[in-house]
Amino acid sequence: MKLQRILLTSALLSACVISSACSAGDSDNPDGKGGSGTGGASTSQGGAANASGGAAMGGASLGNGGSGTGGSVAAFGGASNSGSGGGANGGNGSGGATTGSGGAATAGSSGSGGRSAGGVSNAGGSAAKGGSTSVAGSSSSAGSGNGGSVGSGGSTGAASAEDEGADCQVGTLPDSGALTANSKLPDPFKKLDGTRIASKSEWRCRREEIKKLAEKFVYGEKPAKPTMVTGTVSNSSVTVNVSHNGKSSSFSASISLPSGTGPFPAVVVVGGFGADTTTIKNAGAAIISYDPLAVGKEGTPRNNKQGAFYTIYGSSSTTGLLAAWGWGVSRIIDVIAQSSGSVIKADAIGVTGCSRYGKSAFLIGVLDQRIALTMPIESGSAGVPIWRGIPGEGAQSLSSAYGEQPWFGDAFGAFTSSPTKLPIDTHEIVAMVAPRGLFIMDNPHIANLGPKSAHVAALGGAEVYKALGAGDNISYWSDVQDGTHCAVRPEWKDPLTKSIKKFLLKSGSDPGVIKASSKASGNLADWRDWQTPTLN
């Protein structure tokens, strides 16, 4: 194995030199600061070259997490850097339909894990505004150790709206100057008015509060659907045309269909590397290959952002790239939803990506409730890991992540050295996906990625899943052997297949699993001073 790895390293380094795909790296940065650029094809797992930017779709690779300087390895689709390398699924609770707006569901009511409005059962349908998610079985505690189911029951279906809480009356958000330090993770169940939610139906608007806080202090605003979104869907591509306030832009994504007869569920693969597309297609889902750099370009200053999003909302927009990239996927879903539905199912869409595109996949799934399955891979700082944990873990610093690319919104710059002042943390961002499917994949061998902090975020978010009766719908898996960044891993093949079958094909019911490596296991008890309530 060591000899094979040495030979692979030598070959990839040679390819790196020949193709001029290498860029200067940063020892604190798993993606590499030289990610964007011009010219230079990069090596991908499938062997395809990418001549747009020095890194493959802007992503840089890591070699086995080793530290030091000198040539690192171009691994599975990312361009190499000179510099150091630095869940299964949830169960379908039988009889999980809700009763009307704000009504509590009971196990045994009609429907099959679905959500409904006005008391009408709906297998896999969208949630009513104010409607609660059903509980089909009791939830169990998700521990910080390896393995184990994280709960049971709950809906698995995506919502029919991008933001189901858009009509919620959110109170006054705090000013940054009024924020005080809190070393513990904020209570996800505590509303802006200081009271805690007591029912599942209240989560809809509590979620909206968290969303508004995240947009104000962390990511920048993700605007709602523009005035006009049109486009086409074919067997090979989806095109998107957007018009808003007298401005217009367009972009497209390619489609690769699995065998069989459509329409098919689909997984949006952000950035083009790190995702196990073979397993995804073999499970029966199409691949939508999304180039986020067409929507928000890397390598631009914060006061002159470029791409389809910024053409509409202005180059000086304070919205960061992660939210802008999410806006692009939401517009793709708009077009699919408006199409004939003969190619792609609009209500069975997932999203995945690795490294910087793992950060993107995470937020894409968070901010669009029409996405049924969110699968971030090795997302690192600005992704899943709790911000409060990053300084103590030795992960890429928040100031480094903020300065590397305008991923965060501009406002986050005030918190890079004081994350304890933030009124939210990523366990609440994780919780925003609930009760939909979430499968977080991580790498315990690269401390730079913050895997301990990511594990804590998953455990904290899982508390909300359990409170909503959807504990089976979240998984976290970092128990893997290969430390290569963004590698396609055999340990994830089975849970990936089961996740797709459950959340996209609606044909599975496997319980969620928290399976953390002993190399990077976090402990939620060290980070919280609140307890999970029993919601009505």
Could you describe each region identified by the protein language model?
Residues 331-394, 403, 408, 418-419:
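Primarily recognizes the serine-hydrolase "nucleophile elbow" in alpha/beta-hydrolase
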Residues 269-340, 346, 380-389:
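Cap/lid segment of the alpha/beta-hydrolase catalytic domain
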Residues 263-267, 283-287, 345-348, 369-373, ...:
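Loop/turn elements at helix/coil->beta-strand transitions in domains of secreted/extracellular proteins
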Residues 1-20:
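Sec-dependent bacterial lipoprotein signal peptides
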Residues 161-252, 257-262, 434-536:
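Alpha/beta-hydrolase-fold serine-hydrolase catalytic core, especially in secreted/extracellular enzymes
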Residues 324, 351-354, 376, 409-411, ...:
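Extended catalytic-interface subdomain
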Residues 378-429, 450-458, 464-471:
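Mobile cap/lid helix-loop segments that gate and shape the active-site cleft of serine hydrolases
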Residues 16-163:
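Ser/Thr-rich, Pro/Gly/Ala-heavy low-complexity intrinsically disordered linkers and tails
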